[in-house]
Every structure is written in C-alpha cells, then in structure tokens.
Amino acid sequence: MRITRHTAIGLLAVLAFAAAGPATAQGRAGEPVQTKPDVCLPPERLFDGDGDVTRNRKALGSRDLCLRLDVFSEGQLRWVFQIIQNKKHAAGPLWVVPHDDEDVAFDSAVYAVLRYGGTVVAVERNGDRYNRIGKRKQDPNRNFQVRGEGKCRLQLARSPQFTRNLMRWLHKGQPVIALHTNKAGYDLVPEPDEEKSKGNVSIGIERAEDSHITEFPAARPIRAKSPNDTLIYVASRQKPGNVAQLSRFVAALNQSGIHVLYEHVARNDCSLSNYAVWRNLPYVNIEVVDGDDTGAQTRMIDTVMRLIRSGQGPQR
C-alpha cells in the first residue's frame, strides 16, 4: 500500500490519541471539563491541579458523595469549581473554599460535607489563590455580585454568573460556611493584597476607632497552631449588640474557646460575607493559620454545627 503524506499524518494522529490513554465525555483527569448532568465522577477523574483531591482521595471515594466539575467562562475569566455533594444529606450547609492555596480549608470541607451533609464548592486554580489574566488578578472572595449593584473596587468586572453558579448549591434555610486559612500575624496598616500582606486575620490587633471589625476574644482559646489566628468571622449590617440572636451566637462561641471577629458591613466589597449579609443569609467564616495540623478547624466546625442544630446559630 502506498502511504501518502496525508495518510501518514492521519496515522500519526491516531497513534498519538491512543498513546494519550482512554478518554470519556468528561475529559481526562488532566483536563477540566464540565460534568454532564446526573453524572458523578470518581476521585481519580475529578480535575485536581494541586493535590487537594489526591490528598483526600480515600474520603472522597465515599459512596455518599457525588463529585462534579463546573467549568465556565465569564468575561475574560475561566472558572473551575470542584463540587462535592453529600447525596444522602444534600440539604445541608454550603461549604465554600474560595482560595485554592489553602489546603487545610479543603481538607476540613471534605470532613464537614461527610459529617454534616450539604455541598462543597471549591475554586480550583492549580494551587493559586487568584484567577489571573496577565498581570491582573481576581480574588475569588471578592467576586460575589449583589444584584443591581455595580463592580466593586477589587473586581475586574461584574460577576453575576460566577455568583449564580456558586450560590445555586445553597439549600433554602441552610447556612453559608466559608473555610479559610491565613498567614500568622498581621499588618500594622491593613493590606488588601494577600501577596503583599504579612497577615490580616488575627485577634489582638490595634484597630482604628472607625474600623468595621470588632473583636470578641475568648478567655480560654482552643488548642491551635496559632491561637490568635484561629477564629470565626460573623457579619451583619447592624452594629455589635443590636442583633440578639447573633450576639448570643458570638457569646456561645467565646464560651467554647473560639475568638470572634464581628464585621459591621456598611458598604459592600463583593466578599462572600458581604454578599451573605445583603441577601440576609446565615453566614460563618471559620479561619485557622496556614498549615494548622491540630484539627482546630474541624473542631470549630463541630462547635458551629452543634450551635446551629440547637437553634443557637447566627440566624434562626
């Protein structure tokens, strides 16, 4: 048989495809591809650019969980969400991991969704905190769009699709629980750019009189790698002390050894906490220092869920 140049190119393409290994409609493990409706992926097929899934592979292999990818573009930004849903107890909290460089937060989310149900939405950025376009970058936690409002200062553009795709996993009446890790210590002058900051989430910071953050330190803090960086954020449009239910929640956290930062939201900054306040959603942010290996974050999750289930959460 005479092999023409065209035939040779075709044969090479077939051989290259075969060498690449089997593929499915969901794409290979190395390619983030939108998961089809009603399809659940095994852990080894869930796109994992930085080892989060690999590190939690055994737990994520539970038959109770359904793993998916949500892949979409909005403006110039391409987004990949890892969706982890508890099929047996879907009507639970929405666990949000906005930053892909915060490994402990992802691990805690897997623990939480298995124990308490609901759905995890984790932003997958190959281990990067930001979604980048050249020299510009978007912090996922400054990309929550309140309907009818314009672009916030730290947004590259308005983000209704990002917000809709993430928040659609929230069941009515359930809380939004953000999971984060943070740098040890803090900046004397607040620095919003995390890449320049020495830390901005701590208890015991000397704050300006007009600060929108009020500290409620615990008398006997729980065991943690860095106790002053181990805390819970709550948020409200009302000043501290003006919302009885939220005040009781803060007091109960303090009694359980958990520091609390109370954010008085006067102006929307497109963070998840501000979005939740504007939408009147129950919201908690659970923070530990980077690399905490004491289990402090999962213990705080247990405390928060105990209070919520007993009617002592941030909202009734």
Predicted regions and their residues:
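Bacterial N-terminal signal peptides that target proteins for export
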Residues: 1-9
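Structured catalytic-domain cores with a bias toward divalent-metal coordination
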Residues: 26-316
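Bacterial N-terminal signal peptides
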Residues: 9-19
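Sec/Tat signal peptide C-region and signal peptidase I cleavage site
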Residues: 21-25
